[in-house]
């Protein structure tokens, strides 16, 4: 098998943007994490609605991500990113040598 055929057989990785409006949205986020998707979660609508519900949702998503060996981080004030195994989120404290 040559390199080109190996690349074409690899399944694509998808990036999905999701707006969290309610705690129940965590279920679809869980499914997408298990599928190995890169997720950009917009949390502002849920934050405006109920901060305690947002905190609970973020804690649950964090737990799901860690159990799937995914990486998770905040992107500014309004978003969270979740990446699958093999995709790490750069943080300022990392040494990229």
Predicted regions and their residues:
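Helix-rich interaction surfaces within compact, conserved domain-sized segments
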Residues: 1-3, 64-97
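N-terminal intrinsically disordered, cationic/polar leader segments
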Residues: 1-35
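Flexible beta-alpha connector loops of hexameric P-loop NTPases
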Residues: 15-19, 46-53
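Short glycine-rich, basic-tinged beta-strand/loop micro-motifs
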Residues: 33-46
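Charged helix-capping and loop-helix junction motifs
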Residues: 55-58
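Residue-level signature of catalytic and energy-coupling elements of molecular machines
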Residues: 61
């Amino acid at each position: 098998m040559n390199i080109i055929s190996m690349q074409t057989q690899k399944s694509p990785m998808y990036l999905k943007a999701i707006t969290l409006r309610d705690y129940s949205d965590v279920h679809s986020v869980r499914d997408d994490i298990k599928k190995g998707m890169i997720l950009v979660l917009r949390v502002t609508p849920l934050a405006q609605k109920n901060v305690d519900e947002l905190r609970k949702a973020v804690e649950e998503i964090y737990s799901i991500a860690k159990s799937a060996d995914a990486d998770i981080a905040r992107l500014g004030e309004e978003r969270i990113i979740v990446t699958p195994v093999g995709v790490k989120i750069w943080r300022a404290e990392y040494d990229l040598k």
